[in-house]
Amino acid sequence: GVGNDELATVGGKLAQVVKIMGENVTLQIFAGTEGLSTDSEVVFHGEPPKLRVSDNLAGRFFNAYGEPLEGGEIIEGEAREIGGPTVNPFRRIQPSELIATGIAGIDLNNTIVTGQKIPFFADPDQPYNAVMANVALRAKADKIILGGMGLTNDDFLYFKSVFENAGALDRIVSFVNTTENPPVERLLVPDMALTAAEYFAVDKGEKVLVLLTDMTLYADALAIVSNRMDQIPSKDSMPGSLYSDLAKIYEKAVQLPNGGSITIIAVTTLSGGDITHAIPDNTGYITEGQLFLRNDSDTGKVIVDPFAVASETARHRQEDPRGPSAGDERLRAPLRRRGQRQDQAGERLRPLGLRRAHPEVRLRLLGETAGH
């Protein structure tokens, strides 16, 4: 019989089973139904999307189906079903190892540990993809897995040229959906990226950093499918399953006993800076901490703002019609002063992330902190 998530070909176009009701099967055609006749032939493939995994994935760029973009050789290896279950909690261990990104606003103020899942909130006009490329080049990880959704052609070429020029392709695997590709294909990209990550982390015991951009476009693709299936939309026209769909991705982050790990940093663009929109709102409940990208009014540069959460809370409190109390002001003033003095960022170092840092680095940083 036909199974859920099984691939099919409808009139020469690739599709996937999204619902089975008795003898009726609903298919999502990735490239859309334009040009298809009502009597188009349907051929079921008998299996869901799969990715062939091997060490030869490194240095390659793939599309949403796991096919090489540069026209190189097809990867030979075990074909693994994408979108599988997360690691059994019994097999997980407490994350405690620092994963350095090379960006001070992250490493000093929002230290990331292996196995963590953290969103990167940014406005659509900010250079978040450049930041992701920077993290990919500087991060102290064995493998970097990039999942690009809705990338412009310029962004795709930018990632490719940066990785090639830096000579870092041997540790980077990229899965890319561009604006020229069908939007629904974006739904496959995170699962492809995470299947590759699981191979290197679980099978090879490597430290893997997964970079996903842009999760807002991923959620928009979910909404497209939901609308086509006549499902009742939830908040902000998003599907009611948004939380579960996002959690399925983020919960792949894990620290394993064999030393392997999957750490996820995912860009979520904000519409008009609205942090209360359904996408960032649900993301905040699933993930551990947040990173914010903003324009610094003093320097004119784009920075990673470690104090955006505190300042956002303060702003909402000030807008409260009851007005801020004296106690609130006493609590808020030190935060405001701290946010204005980026050179004191070391005070917010996370001891958890420093446990396995180089001894000299740890002593120097903790010594600076103690000196304030």
Regions found by a protein language model. Name each.
Residues 1-101:
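Acidic-enriched and Gly/Ser
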Residues 102-107:
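Short, charged beta->alpha transition segments
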Residues 108-371:
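P-loop NTPase catalytic core
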